[in-house]
Amino acid sequence: PIFSVSPADRAIVVTTPHVSAIHDARRCISLLDSAHLDDISVIVNAYDKHMVRRHQMISDNDITALLSTRIIGTIPYDKSVIICQNRGIPVREAKSRLGPVFARISGQIIHSSDDMRGAAV
């Protein structure tokens, strides 16, 4: 599995703020580190800030500390995603607050890729 990332210059690990998922993300990041991949970042999916405030979910700051990796995006929990999946409708077509979130994260990924290409020239 490590050989499959050898041509990559970056990796984005997507996880959820659940203990088992953070454990799996840490193992994945460790494998990517052993493949000498330097640019590793994380996207946190299904994040519920209300649960974080009630200490029922791991915070994004704790995730950053546990994974020793920067978070480039946090996607809030939104039940409309489940409804869209069950109906076969793209999330971007639903009346959801996630459209701008996905646009911001994808823009950040694209711009950081452009910055990396510019630095290599």
Please tell me what each predicted stretch does.
Residues Q85-L98:
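C-terminal boundary of histidine-terminating zinc-finger modules
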Residues V101-M116:
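C-terminal alpha-helix
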